[in-house]
Amino acid sequence: MYLPENASRARLRQAENARSNRQEILTAWSQGQISRRDLIKLGLFTAAGTIILKSGLSPFAASADSTIPTGLPASPLFGVQPFTQPMPRLDLLARNAVSTLSPAPTAEANTTQQVLNPALEGVRPGDTGPIEGRPPGPIWAHQAFNQFFPQVAIEVTELGARTNTTYNPGVPSSLNSGINPAAPIPPRFHPSLPDQGPNAVWTYQGTFPPKLAQFRYGESALFRNHNGLPFSITQNGGFGRHTTSTHRHNGHHGAENDGFTGAFFFPGQFYDYHYPLTLAGFRTINPAATDPNAGGPADNGGIIKVPGDWHETMSSHWFHDHMFGFTSQNVYKGLAGMMNLYSAKDRGNEAINDGINLRLPSGTAKAWGNLDYDVNIMLADKAWNSNGQLAFDIFETDGFLGDVMTVNGAFKPFFEVERRKYRFRMLNAAVARFFTISLSDASPMIQIANDGNLLPNPVTLTQLDELGIAERYEIVIDFSRYPIGGKVWMVNLAEHEDGRRVANDLTLSQALSGTSPDPGVGRFLEFRIVRDPATPDQSQVPAVLIPNPDLSQVPVTRTRRFVFGDKGSQTTTDPVTSGRGPWGIGTDGGGQLNADFGRVSAAPKFGTREIWELVNDGGGWDHPIHVHFEESQILARNGSASNVPAWEKGRKDVFRLRPDGSVTITTQFRDFGGMFMEHCHNTTHEDNAMLLRWEIDDSGAPFVRPLPTPIPKPQGVTFQSPDDILPSAF
């Protein structure tokens, strides 16, 4: 997709002009000045939602004086070389008492009125609306709010890029590659690259690096998100939408806290997300909280016992925007962070040896949540324009690929390590790019978790499986094998030709050769071995981590089949709830439908277990499918249990279908009610429009059947009946 550095000036000029032309269209569309239907009428989009193959517009059309496609202009690096800046640890969010929140959190949405800013679309001078954007009333009230009343609060604000003067990596400078936390951090991908403008990048708190929240089981949390983005829809730097909805991927809680794509809120509002932080199955399994394996870490080194099944313990989540039709743009723009969960089994203290704590690499200074040797890594490919400002292109609906690799928001950094074991929590936060990761010397890595769930048993690998968008792999690397002064690199072997799928998984030597036309291939993170540890490494990787829940006594009540493909069509017309694009999902033998968050596609009964078959209907693409709400187990790949590799034998929430492939999963629907989602996490596919709504049926008052659809406006959320209910849903 991207032109090589030695491309002719004429091709570079044509490519830049074409991108500029596309950016004008993108700006008009993202700011609501023109609709997708208008683009089709003007002959700029096909009915399938792809850009017309037209010279001066499409990067894939021949130019006026050449039969060679113009391609995309490479992101300028302004002379910056790889591995010349330290990788920053993620920025730790402050944990405060709930009493510090004003106004205090409430079970139902806070409908206190405020005067609205007339720059908001559809707002007249003097209009008022609620201060909280959560839909009002009992259906969207926090479930189990009093049972799990919040004990800790984390408060964030979505803002445009600005300098970070309060950076908190959670570790001393010596364990953060020498970064001085007191030094201001400008909004740059490298110290020698330009500052990002306030509307080029939007992040939580408006600052670099991305944020990290620490939670523990047994300490319910209130996550208050303020929308501080520009009031005017036009102030977006050319892409992104200022209405947002925050998804905790993949939290087990009520739907009102899930970041439903249609429950978005506006600048000037906040939304309170309540995280019970207890274990799945808490209503029927270990309800008296007597099992010491089921719990969180106490401040004295002990355990806070919680109800639920300890086999459902999770370790790594992330949070990101889920705005309908704009998820790819908003997440790419910076609205994403990570969450670490600590438990009785995984306390973040490697010294506690009580027969329950697994003692994974972390540290020992604090009772729980040590980050010394527990490192978050957020991977994303980016691109920027000739001025160095973040750039995005919606017109390749196969999936946007960047040509610059970033780790924790930094262009190809280095990270200093000691000669001991480290745990790395790796997240693919890209739009469409997959990663296949190896170390440059092919040394072994121990995979301990998949999608935030510790595996039943660790798996030793020299090359990780493809890491799909939104998947999380946790690995342990032992750097004691290297001498002080040594270096080793993380390498990406997955070569893309477009955003549909990985074209080739290269050999390590091929990836290191520098000959791949894909700029995302090769070294992206340098480890520098700088010293021996000051104290002995007390961490371990036990042979048994967290076994899967026993489902043998849980009957299967229903099987459903979902087919994901490029034959999407739309049967509804509501401009707020319905999307359009080439991608769609077929349910139980029906046609592939574009997204409509007002359509009910499935409604499993509360307290039951189902089997879902997820099918990719083509060989030309891959889809990482995310099912919200509760972790699932993979029963089969392509119809056979023997095709499930060891690293997929734990619980998961993202399922790479692979070209022409299928994945059969089983899931329980318990504890909470409401409406949830299932979608492709190639967020370009999701936005164009591979997403469906499902809801939990018969979960008791106040829920009704079917649930009304929320329609957010600055003046308040209203409700309407579903646009459509598929015949096989209930």
Regions found by a protein language model. Name each.
Residues 26, 45-50, 54-75, 367:
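Bacterial Sec-dependent N-terminal signal peptides
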Residues 1-38, 47, 60-63:
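N-terminal secretory signal peptides
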Residues 141-342, 346-351, 433-468, 488-508, ...:
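Histidine- and aromatic-enriched segments that form or immediately flank copper-ligand environments
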Residues 250-279, 379-543, 548, 642:
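Histidine- and aromatic-rich segments of cupredoxin/plastocyanin-like copper-binding domains
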